[in-house]
Amino acid sequence: MVAYYHDNTLLHESEILHNMENQLLHTPDGVRDIYNGECKKKLYLQDKLHRTLLKYGYHDIMTPTFEFFNIFGSDVGTTPSKDLYKFFDKEGNTLVLRPDFTPSIARSAAKYYIEDDMPVKLCYLGNTFINSSDYQGRLKESTQCGAELIGDGSISADAEILSMTVESMLESGLKNFQISVGHSQFFYGLTKAAGLSGEQEENLRELIANKNFFGVEEFVDSLSMNDKLRKLFGLLDNFDLQDEQLMEALKLAKGYDEILSSIDTLLKLREYLKAYGIEKYISYELGLISDYTYYTGIIFQGYTYGTGEPIVKLSLIHISEPTRH
C-alpha cells in the first residue's frame, strides 16, 4: 500500500482515490444537474413559453455564449465587472460568458438589421452566467427565456409586451401572481429635479433597491426642495398606486418634464391594459428601478408566492435606430 503526506496527514492511496472520485461526482458551487422528472418539466415549460412568444410574432435568435468584454461593459450597465466570468483567448482578447442576453441581441440587431426593418421582434432561450458570491445562495448559471422588441417605442407596444407576459405566466400554470409596473424616467426625473450629485443618486438608488424607505425618508429630509417635489419623493414607497394617486402625481409633476412624461405614460398604458383585460394582474409602483442603465422606459417585475426573487424581470428598450444600443 502506497502512502502520501498531505498537510501533515498520512493518506493511503485508497483515501486519495476516494477523494478524487468524490470531487468528480460533484459540481462547483452555483451550478447543478437537472435530470429525470425535473428536466422533463423544465423542457415542457420552456416549450410553452416559447410557443407564446412565437404567437405574438417574435422570431428566434441565437447569440454566442461568450462575447468580447466591451459588449457587457459599463456603458450598457448590465452586470458589475467583478461578477462577470472573464477569460482570454489565444490572441489576448478579454472574453465574457454572457450575464444577460440584451446587449448581445442589440449588437446583432445593429449588425444585421437596418432602419427599414424596424420594428424587429426577437426572442431567445438559453443560459446566462453571473459569478455571484457563494454566500448569496444563488445559482451562477440560470436559464432565461425572453423577448426583445426593437424600434417601437409606442405605448401600445409596451401594453402588448405586458399582455404577452401575463399570458406567459398563465400558460406556465400560475394563477396567483402580480406584475408591478413603473417607469425608469420617474427616478431619473426626481434626481434631476432635486439636483442630486452622482454619488447622491447612487446612494438613493441603493436605498430604494434595498426597500429601505426609512432611509429614503431620512435622505429626502436632508435635502432642500419644495413641497411638490417632496410629495413626489413620498410616492417611492407605495407599491400599489391607485388611479386617483396617479392623477394627483400628474398634477404635482407639472414643471418637471421627465417626471410628468413618465406618469403620463403610465396613465395611458393603464387604459391599454384595461382593454387587454389584464388590469387585475397589474399594480403601479413608481419606486421600481432597473439595475440596467440602458433601460429607458417602462419597467415591470412579476411576483408569485413562494419565491424570494421576481420570476419576471423585464424592461423595455426604445430604440429608433439599430445603431443606437
What are these regions (language model features)?
Residues 140-145, 181-189:
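Short, conserved phosphate-binding/catalytic loop or strand-edge motifs used
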Residues 20-39:
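Auxiliary tRNA-acceptor-end handling modules of aminoacyl-tRNA synthetases
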Residues 38-56, 67-68, 81, 102-115, ...:
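Positively charged, Gly/Ser-enriched RNA/tRNA-binding surfaces
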Residues 176-186, 204, 283-289:
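Short, surface-exposed recognition loops or helix-turn segments adjacent to catalytic cores
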Residues 7-9, 13:
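Short hydrophobic alpha-helical segments enriched in small aliphatic residues
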Residues 188-198, 293-300:
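Short glycine/threonine-rich loop-to-helix capping motif typified by GTGT followed
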Residues 61, 65-95:
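Polyanion/phosphate-binding surface patch
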Residues 83-89, 196-216, 304:
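Acidic, His- and aromatic-enriched active-site or binding-groove loops in soluble protein domains
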